A protein has these predicted regions:
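Rossmann-fold NAD(P)-binding glycine/threonine-rich loop
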Residues: 77, 85-107, 118-127
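C-terminal substrate-binding/catalytic lobe of Rossmann-fold NAD(P)-dependent oxidoreductases
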Residues: 2-6, 10-50, 133-227
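Residue-level detector of anion-binding/catalytic polar loops
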Residues: 25, 81, 106
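A general structural signal for well-ordered alpha-helical segments in protein cores
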Residues: 12, 68, 93-96, 120, ...
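Rossmann-fold NAD(P) dinucleotide-binding segment
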Residues: 48-58, 62-85, 94-97
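Short, acidic/turn-prone active-site loops that include or flank metal/cofactor-
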Residues: 32-35, 86-90, 113
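A charged, well-structured terminal subsegment
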Residues: 122, 126-138
Length: 227
């Protein structure tokens, strides 16, 4: 398959390596800052034109929350299947969904493409369902990533929160960032840390007076996100 990669940072390079190992042909890499990118521009329309001329049969977008909406708008009309790995843009999801329908295009998005993280979602959902019957347990989420990650909390943490809120009846509201020092019982907190080169760690705490149950997923590298 001929693939174009939009966003040629650490994840873009990792995606290229894995794509080639699987017998795919990366025909274009787009990034205004990467010295080894084959097309250097941040202009979404110019990127779309370059991709069309490259003969790409699939597009993988892994850029920045500030760029992803314009990229999607420019790329969908090409009619080429688009996979989006960028997080931090879900406030625009309704607009993007409408555009996808208007252009009769294919767009696939997930907060995290790691097999382990998607298994973790199911574990959290089941644990939250079990613990929901025990009022003595409180719950909170904490996540840590490298100090260059653009969004906070992570898209993965927000997705984990969805599973907790769906399955733990005592939690009905999500709070993150500057949350109150004394949260209400119904509030689910997400705490975020940005430090060093951490690929990604997510922990869900179920805490009571008697004990604490911790569920943690720790990524060892970015490779799991690119598989």
């Amino acid at each position: 398959m001929k693939i174009a990669i939009v966003g040629y940072g650490k994840m873009g390079h990792m995606i290229e390596n894995i794509a080639k190992k699987r017998g795919n042909n990366v025909v274009l890499t787009c990034d205004p800052y990467a010295e080894d990118a084959t097309f250097k521009s941040s202009d979404s329309e110019a990127i779309a034109k370059a991709i069309k001329e490259s003969g790409a049969e699939g597009i993988i977008e892994f850029t920045h929350p500030d760029s992803v909406e314009n990229n999607i708008k420019a790329l969908l009309p090409l009619g080429i299947p688009l996979v989006v790995g960028t997080t931090g843009w879900l406030s625009k999801l309704e607009k993007v969904t409408a555009l996808t329908k208007e252009t009769n295009s294919n767009l696939f998005y997930a907060a995290n493409y790691s097999i382990g993280v998607n298994l973790f979602y199911k574990i959290v959902a089941e644990a939250s369902k079990l613990i929901s019957d025990f009022d003595e347990y409180d719950c909170a989420i904490w996540e840590a990533h490298h100090n260059t990650k653009a969004d906070s909390p992570s898209g993965t943490a927000l997705k984990i929160a969805d599973y907790v809120l769906e399955n733990m009846k005592s939690k009905t509201e999500l709070v993150n960032g500057n949350f109150p020092c004394k949260p209400e019982k119904h509030q689910l907190q997400i705490g975020s840390t940005r430090v060093g080169s951490v690929p990604g760690t997510h922990t869900v705490y179920y805490d009571s007076v008697a004990d604490t149950i911790e569920l943690t997923h720790t990524a060892r590298s970015r490779e799991g996100f690119a598989l």
